[in-house]
Amino acid sequence: MSQFIIRRSNDILSKYLPIKYEHVVFCHLSPFQLALYDLFLRSPAIARLLRGNGSQPLKAIGILKKLCNHPDLLSLPDDLEGSEELFPEGYKPGDRRHVAVELSGKLSVLTRFLASIRSTTDDKIVLISNYTQTLDLFERLCRLRRWGFFRLDGTMNINKRQKLVDRFNDPTAPEFIFLLSSKAGGCGLNVIGANRLVLFDPDWNPASDQQALARVWRDGQKKACFVYRFIATGSIEEKILQRQSDKQSLSS
């Protein structure tokens, strides 16, 4: 039987899986994020793009998306000219010794959420991001808070990935957080040891997000599942969410 694969879609399995709750969590940008966001939108680079003279629209989109996660994902002040005038007192770009949680609206919400899960439940949770830089932030946060975690991204050897997932799925494992790159593992990665999942940033392709959101809601799951999509309000992430909705309505 090991030579064969049983192909079953979620349409079939959903009849036998526990209930799944999906939530969209809208988070305000921090004052620092908002100031940087406004600075970039008013920059000469964006003005050139709006006039049709710019040659790097994808770079601009990338800056906005990273800024929605945390200012530390950018190379400041190089990525945003003049941003050093907006730095909060004591802020040091690129400081890897700690995580400035308060400088990101989404990370502030996530930190309080993880602390609540840890103290009030025995649930495990998967944290997914499109950026390994965001996973680096999560990892530093977990180490500082002494939260047990595993991490899987594209740099991990394929042979080691399933072993790591199996360790996390073991109910006796003390680690309650699984850090996952959205593109790692393909369609077959089942992290059923967790029944909660946070998608920290959206992808333009709704199929990619749906695949990521289904990691915990797979065959073998015994508990009710909760998935949370974090969206920075008033930002490019709302536009991405809107585009996803439009694409899904066209395909349905």
Model regions: which residues?
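Conserved Helicase C-terminal RecA-like lobe
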Residues: 15-33, 41, 52-177, 181-185
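Short, flexible segments with low predicted structural confidence
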Residues: 7-9, 113
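SF2 helicase/translocase ATPase core recognition
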Residues: 6, 13-44, 160, 176-252
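Short amphipathic alpha-helical interaction/hinge segments
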Residues: 9-12, 48-49, 68, 72-75, ...
